[in-house]
Amino acid sequence: MASIEEIAHQIIEQQMGEISRSQTEVSQTALMDGTTQRIQLVPSESNVSVPQRIQIVTDPQTGQKIQIVTALDQSGVSKQFILTNNDGSLPSKVILARQDSNQGKVFLTTPDAAGMNQLFFSSPDVPAQHIQILSDTQSLDQNLNKQLVELCVVCGDKASGRHYGAVTCEGCKGFFKRSIRKNLVYTCRGSKDCVINKHYRNRCQYCRLQRCMSLGMKQDSVQCERKPIEVSREKSSNCAASTEKIYIRKDLRSPLAATTTFVTENKTPRTTSLLDSSMLVNIQQSGVKNESILITPNKVEACQGDLSTLANVVTSLANLNKTNDLPQTNTELSIIESLSNGDSSLSDLAQDDQSSSEVTRAFDTLAKALNQSENSTQGSSECLGSNANLLHDVNVEIEGPLLNDVHIAFRLTMPSPMPEYLNVHYICESASRLLFLSMHWARSIPSFQSLGQENSISLVKACWNELFSLGLAQCSQVMNVETILAAFVNHLQNSMQHDKLSSDKVKLVTDHIFKLQEFCNSMVKLCVDGYEYAYLKAIALFSPDHPGLENVSHIEKLQEKAYMEFQDYVTKTYPEDTYRLSRLLLRLPALRLMNAAITEELFFAGLIGNVQIDSIIPYILRMETSDYNSQIIGLAV
């Protein structure tokens, strides 16, 4: 029969401690502090002076962490212990420890009012150390007679074996594997100390993943499964730029943490220009990390669909064109064929000597096909067009509010998985989703639809950059806008040092980036809420001073209505902030200073090459949600 000393020597040490062994009489009557998370077992005999070993275990039913202190003596007889707090204060009830005939078991008997509660502690010769609460002698006997069941060290469920370095259940094994393989990034809504057990393990993925890693599950084990051994090859000089990436930290909390690190495939630091040939196009698409984040009220409405990328929308348009018999030139057919093949970027078309005018003609072809399809399937389209023409001469009174709760909620679902290295594809895809969401938001406003197709398209063409900039400010935290802009500036500086860009070009783009950053920061400082963002967008959308608009007086009335509702909301919601409305409205002129062409280069050239956003706006406004919602990103939590 093994002694307690032999058993204790096998316990995995987490810390060594000399624990005070006083408070013998008080400890037998004191109650356990319910708020204490960690407790200790201390020998109650004042004359016992032996070293002790400490192991932290977790009660799977309560999730409470318990420190078990085992006395190292040679007697092997029952010993009396006391449950105390980690600092030795607030002693609790007495525990009697005895060794079972089985060499791998030590029982800690806790007397209480309901009877004898048995705390069964398994020693390390059994693979999983754990505590089981046995309420009576019968259950104790049953537990001794049946084979010992291993418990998951993460949640306390029945373990299926050792996975990635720790004994876990199938659920925690799969969760850890998915999290590491896809490099998922979670957030904790609490204080990062959530209880993780069999019943609550799915409530906080962040704390569950942290617990997996803290209890010995190794990320490297999963990485080795999915990452093949790479054979070192000699790369030619012309492909060096395409293999460079920007490393982005996932725990960014401030602009100081947004410093980017440039590495190549062999992890050798070097720099390159992001702004040559449509700026960011030369960065390789790479890496996997995930972050699905939800902002604003959790309402599933028409304007909150999970939006696909700009390239996928164009692909959807090309697929629609296949159903029409419209004659096309060889150039247009080649472009449409390239789109239909599922290419994720149109930048390749520019590299294949396809000019922007040819791409634009292909879009014009798609527009004609869509118009033909609409005319053949909807007999009411002519009626809608005639009604729209009436608006050129008649001002329509708008009944009810301009915006309702559907238009206040503004949810952006980020691309998933998030890349380990910030790259052009992730930046452009994130921006395209924000652009789609802004377009779809505008289209969902009934007053906007009443303007007619041509007028509504003209409005969006004139103000899409303002709507996009407001969306960037609203989603700045979700998109890590500061990090993206910091990467832009860093690469601009490197490009200028290597004479890849003229100083005038660098200054122009840098000024634009700083204006955008200043605008986003000012909106964050004002703590603008969802209602205020919605009304600011409406005021920017219904601007009657853009050239080429028809029925300007009606558009002006819509803007006035948006302003009046905005004023009413701010007055009622922030009665003590007298100048809040003025401060918010004074941010709008800064949007007019944003250069739309530079915004296109920075955020969209990586997906659509030299195609201008203005040429794509009509198709986005004309499409149904189902047409560009083909890729379900997943529900944001």
From Swiss-Prot:
<dbReference type="InterPro" id="IPR048246">
    <property type="entry name" value="NR2C1/2-like_LBD"/>
</dbReference>
<keyword id="KW-0862">Zinc</keyword>
<dbReference type="InterPro" id="IPR001628">
    <property type="entry name" value="Znf_hrmn_rcpt"/>
</dbReference>
<keyword id="KW-0805">Transcription regulation</keyword>
<dbReference type="InterPro" id="IPR013088">
    <property type="entry name" value="Znf_NHR/GATA"/>
</dbReference>
<dbReference type="InterPro" id="IPR050274">
    <property type="entry name" value="Nuclear_hormone_rcpt_NR2"/>
</dbReference>
<keyword id="KW-0539">Nucleus</keyword>
<dbReference type="GO" id="GO:0004879">
    <property type="term" value="F:nuclear receptor activity"/>
</dbReference>
<dbReference type="InterPro" id="IPR048245">
    <property type="entry name" value="NR2C1/2-like_DBD"/>
</dbReference>
<dbReference type="Pfam" id="PF00104">
    <property type="entry name" value="Hormone_recep"/>
</dbReference>
<feature type="zinc finger region" description="NR C4-type">
    <location>
        <begin position="152"/>
        <end position="172"/>
    </location>
</feature>
<dbReference type="GO" id="GO:0045892">
    <property type="term" value="P:negative regulation of DNA-templated transcription"/>
</dbReference>
<feature type="domain" description="NR LBD">
    <location>
        <begin position="383"/>
        <end position="624"/>
    </location>
</feature>
<feature type="zinc finger region" description="NR C4-type">
    <location>
        <begin position="188"/>
        <end position="207"/>
    </location>
</feature>
<dbReference type="InterPro" id="IPR000536">
    <property type="entry name" value="Nucl_hrmn_rcpt_lig-bd"/>
</dbReference>
<dbReference type="InterPro" id="IPR035500">
    <property type="entry name" value="NHR-like_dom_sf"/>
</dbReference>
<dbReference type="GO" id="GO:0003677">
    <property type="term" value="F:DNA binding"/>
</dbReference>
<dbReference type="GO" id="GO:0030154">
    <property type="term" value="P:cell differentiation"/>
</dbReference>
<keyword id="KW-0804">Transcription</keyword>
<dbReference type="InterPro" id="IPR001723">
    <property type="entry name" value="Nuclear_hrmn_rcpt"/>
</dbReference>
<dbReference type="GO" id="GO:0005634">
    <property type="term" value="C:nucleus"/>
</dbReference>
<keyword id="KW-0675">Receptor</keyword>
<dbReference type="GO" id="GO:0008270">
    <property type="term" value="F:zinc ion binding"/>
</dbReference>
<dbReference type="GO" id="GO:0006357">
    <property type="term" value="P:regulation of transcription by RNA polymerase II"/>
</dbReference>
<keyword id="KW-0010">Activator</keyword>
<keyword id="KW-0678">Repressor</keyword>
<comment type="function">
    <text>Orphan nuclear receptor. Binds the IR7 element in the promoter of its own gene in an autoregulatory negative feedback mechanism. Primarily repressor of a broad range of genes. Binds to hormone response elements (HREs) consisting of two 5'-AGGTCA-3' half site direct repeat consensus sequences.</text>
</comment>
<dbReference type="GO" id="GO:0000122">
    <property type="term" value="P:negative regulation of transcription by RNA polymerase II"/>
</dbReference>
<keyword id="KW-0238">DNA-binding</keyword>
<comment type="similarity">
    <text>Belongs to the nuclear hormone receptor family. NR2 subfamily.</text>
</comment>
<dbReference type="Pfam" id="PF00105">
    <property type="entry name" value="zf-C4"/>
</dbReference>
<keyword id="KW-0863">Zinc-finger</keyword>
<protein>
    <recommendedName>
        <fullName>Nuclear receptor subfamily 2 group C member 1-A</fullName>
    </recommendedName>
</protein>
<feature type="DNA-binding region" description="Nuclear receptor">
    <location>
        <begin position="149"/>
        <end position="224"/>
    </location>
</feature>
<dbReference type="GO" id="GO:0000978">
    <property type="term" value="F:RNA polymerase II cis-regulatory region sequence-specific DNA binding"/>
</dbReference>
<keyword id="KW-0479">Metal-binding</keyword>
